[in-house]
Amino acid sequence: MAFKQLLSAVTLALAASAASVTRRATCPDGTQLMNAECCALLAVRDDLQNNMFNNECGDEAHEALRLTFHDAIAISPAMEATGQFGGGGADGSIMIFSDIETKFHPNIGLDEVVESFRPFQQRSGMGVADFIQFSGAVGTSNCPGAPTLNAFIGRKDATQAAPDGLVPEPFHDVNTILARFNDAGDFDELETVWFLIAHSVAAQNDIDPAVSHAPFDSTPSVMDGQFFIETQLRGVEFIGSGGIEGVAESPVKGEFRLMSDQQIARDNRTACEWQSFGTDQAKLQNRFQFIFEAMGQLGTDPTTLIDCSDVLPVPPPLSTVPHFPAGITINDVEPACAETPFPTLPTDPGPATAVAAVPRD
């Protein structure tokens, strides 16, 4: 609770400060920003957009967002209370100590991601912790429907690796996952669901290599509610090898489902919040904007950070509407929210949907 109270206070203070300040810094290229310290990030942004993301919400943008979470969530006040080192949160340790942390089971595949981003970080002039969170925000700005995220600089880089066991796994049960988020930042069950909005623009690469880059929903390049709709559909078959721990049956050909997502979508503590994101895009954007900021401040003193949010591009608008994939109807839904009926949605016309893998950049 203390962390979230501090975050709320800092957010209000920043908003009040921004409203009262009329003078803005002018960067060497003529761009005006709220803080002069952020001018150097303009070149970093452009380098990432032009040479890594190609201004697209593709594989590299997805991985950049994944990296922000796997770095930041590795913090445990409960471990600290017992005299153990509990990790530093958003401190860049997953890149600084990549030889250790990318060997942790939940970080499988991130060794290649870290190395692909390392040259960008090295020429950016940014600290590693700041770079990881900034690159995730820049990449997500390419996703239609995403909110304009916040970007802050001034974090302290890690001096030791985070301990293993702090990143949730797809085979963990709901109680374990909720406890992990609560320990990391006093996040409750609803806020845990907010983190999973990131799965709207995501795919798996290494859980089942037989179907590498299989997305979690039918619109992986768009941050919309389809992930929340489609995870509530009845699974009918494994799209890959089958029998892999943490993998559930999928409702749509080509779509990958994590067991953890399936269970959280159906748990009575989280099901109604989950269902709400299927049709409420404004809420989805608002909650993800908040939780991304909160995540990026784990392990930091937010009062020491500099707001560089105005460096970030504005995401493209959403052009899709909530729907069932072709071949799916309301009869395929496994409703789990006792408070609100599952919404009535149109079904896409044509033959049954088959979802393509996310193209490799």
Curated annotation (Swiss-Prot):
Catalytic site positions: H70
Binding locations of Ca(2+) 1: D71, G89, D91, S93
Keywords: Calcium, Glycoprotein, Heme, Hydrogen peroxide, Iron, Lignin degradation, Metal-binding, Oxidoreductase, Peroxidase, Signal
InterPro entries the UniProt entry points to: Ccp1-like, Haem_peroxidase, Haem_peroxidase_sf, Ligninase, Ligninase_C, Peroxidases_AS
Chain residues that bind heme b: H199
Glycosylated residues (UniProt): N268
Biochemical pathway: Secondary metabolite metabolism; lignin degradation
Binding site for Ca(2+) 2: S200, D217, T219, V222, D224
Cofactor: Ca(2+); heme b
Disulfide bonds: none
Signal peptide: 1-20
Protein name, entry field: Ligninase-3
Native source species: Phlebia radiata (White-rot fungus)
